[in-house]
């Protein structure tokens, strides 16, 4: 009997140790980003910088998660491919036990992942993917902290109206991002009866020569060229349009914020001046306390100012940690409820919410949309002219 009691006591002690160890396991947050072609690896690295500093913030100033548990980042490369993105999400959820997955940059990847996520139940937060259906399908698991296609298009139609442009050439990659923006531009221009002449040309994201379609653009004599390429095709279009004499005589608008990256002037030393581009953050914008901490930590580590991709990567990871705290659980259903019903601190002064709103605004929080212009070679993006400022969810 004494031996039995000793064994039972030992078993209880071992169980207690195991449970304590389990309770102290880190909270894993998944980061799915493009780190290799045909994805945009520069975007992936910038988002990763933000995510890694977010872990430092969570385990430092924030004081951990659920008491004394640390946060940990698990990173997967989506390669900008849907099949790789789905496999990466499955690994993060099934093998690494991530409580949520964020970092998504390519819309096609995020859309494909969400079809799997709605079955597995672990939520996703789009960091820089804008296709309407990411949130427009109203999946409980799908959240976003980035501008959506209709808002981006509304911003550049404002720009087109202000400039009095009528003939618009749109060169769009055949991805959900590219096709979605082209279709949304057609839709809104018809609804507003803008009487625009739209030339819409498409190309494969893996294209290495855009000369044939750029020659069609040149023959069209547009007032504006909208470059809806991501990563290498976007850079290629800038250079080849200049070689063919389309730009700078005809202005070009880049559909996202690639020109703010430190590498931009290395790639386009002679062709970058005069370009217009979309941005989501102005250095005049007020940061939250967490955002100020991040900006200082980023500059100390990388010797340069943070850009939007890094800021939003940081924000999404700390939002997930806050949601775990508010839910008092890592259970996906509890996490989703917390995300839907609470307010969260991010890098902006405004708090972030994910209301069950109508249409594409479901589970969506958006930064402002800016259109900036470089007016000189090697210009710091923070000195670029602000041509259009279009409201998002942030002030």
What do these predicted ranges mean?
Residues 17-23:
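Sec/Tat signal peptide C-region and signal peptidase I cleavage site
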